[in-house]
């Protein structure tokens, strides 16, 4: 079962940040990218904008299973915070795409001039390191509870 205190801290962290590292792969081909994101805590999802012709997008269209990180850039080890995640990503269309685009453009107004597609990354698993709570402190969240 997910610890409610962990979930609150993870959600707060994801709301405060705005850049993720996204890693996609298919077979022996792998690629990473940095993307701006908007967090939807009700769906435990991240919305991001990236063109379909990029290497990472082409891989995501073949294999929607992705992993990545969201991290602060702290110079002090005692303040390091960051998330490792695993999820499934899909290209949005229709009403879902319009709603996500509206949220994304509110957060990043410069995106209003872009026609790049929006993607929804449904988080499946999160491990957060939060040294502010004690060196090496780990918080966990999982969409699917273990059997």
UniProtKB/Swiss-Prot annotation:
InterPro entries: Split_barrel_FMN-bd, UPF0306. Signal peptide: none annotated. It comes from the Bacteria. Transmembrane segments: none annotated. Belongs to the UPF0306 family. NCBIfam families: PRK03467.1. This is UPF0306 protein YPK_3704. It comes from Yersinia pseudotuberculosis serotype O:3 (strain YPIII). The lineage of its organism: Bacteria, Pseudomonadati, Pseudomonadota, Gammaproteobacteria, Enterobacterales.
